């Protein structure tokens, strides 16, 4: 393993932590309708568990309304149950093979709870980033021990790894701040 591949791997894995964090945040309600709100939900379909978007189309016809068009009418009940039991506080209205889901206003208590969840997701992303940093540092120490790089180069590269870590954590904090303001905005 050479230095360039180590640095590329670190960058890719840290970017992956940010992508995963953004995906987690996408599932949090902000008061505006978003199809990503229902994407993490699963439903049992013919003996296997699949995501809702694999058995239905999810669209946003209005800012405070989700519309779910289920492809198979035998799945409507299961999709409705999955949405009701999701803990998102949503009550779908069934109309044939379609579900209309009005999004109620978030109260202050629920907003604070969502912010707390967002902070938890951010901390998970930071921890993942630090784990990647530790792996990178271990690889650099191994290269130095094996004599593939010198002590000065190892020190310089560890500073680059730390800088990359700091930038990634700063990006996570920026994304969190934006999401927090979205959640708290009435």
Curated annotation (Swiss-Prot):
Which gene name does the record give? frr
Matching entries from InterPro entries are given as:
Ribosome_recyc_fac, Ribosome_recyc_fac_dom, RRF_sf
Protein localization:
Cytoplasm
- Report any one BP term from Gene Ontology: cytoplasmic translational termination
Supply the alphabetized keyword list. Cytoplasm, Protein biosynthesis
Primary localisation category:
cytoplasm
Q: Which domain of life is it from?
A: Bacteria
Which family is this protein grouped under?
Belongs to the RRF family.
Transmembrane regions: none
| Protein name per Swiss-Prot or TrEMBL | Ribosome-recycling factor
| Functional note | Responsible for the release of ribosomes from messenger RNA at the termination of protein biosynthesis. May increase the efficiency of translation by recycling ribosomes from one round of translation to another.
GO molecular function: any one?
A: ribosomal large subunit binding
Q: Which GO cellular component terms are attached?
A: cytosol
């Amino acid at each position: 393993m050479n230095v360039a591949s180590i640095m590329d791997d670190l960058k890719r894995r840290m970017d992956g932590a940010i992508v995963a964090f953004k995906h987690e945040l996408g599932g949090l309600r902000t008061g505006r309708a978003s199809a990503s709100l229902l994407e993490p939900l699963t439903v049992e379909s013919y003996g296997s568990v699949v995501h809702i978007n694999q058995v239905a189309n999810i669209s946003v016809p209005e800012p405070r309304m989700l519309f779910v068009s289920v492809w198979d009418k035998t799945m409507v009940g299961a999709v409705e149950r999955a949405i009701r039991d999701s803990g998102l506080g949503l009550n779908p209205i069934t109309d044939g093979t379609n579900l209309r889901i009005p999004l109620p206003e978030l109260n202050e208590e629920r907003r604070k709870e969502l912010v707390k969840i967002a902070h938890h997701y951010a901390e998970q992303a930071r921890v993942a980033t630090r784990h990647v940093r530790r792996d990178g540092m271990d690889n650099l120490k191994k290269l130095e021990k094996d004599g593939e790089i010198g002590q000065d180069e190892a020190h310089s590269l560890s500073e680059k790894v730390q800088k990359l870590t700091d930038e990634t954590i700063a990006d996570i904090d920026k994304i969190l701040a934006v999401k927090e303001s979205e959640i708290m905005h009435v």
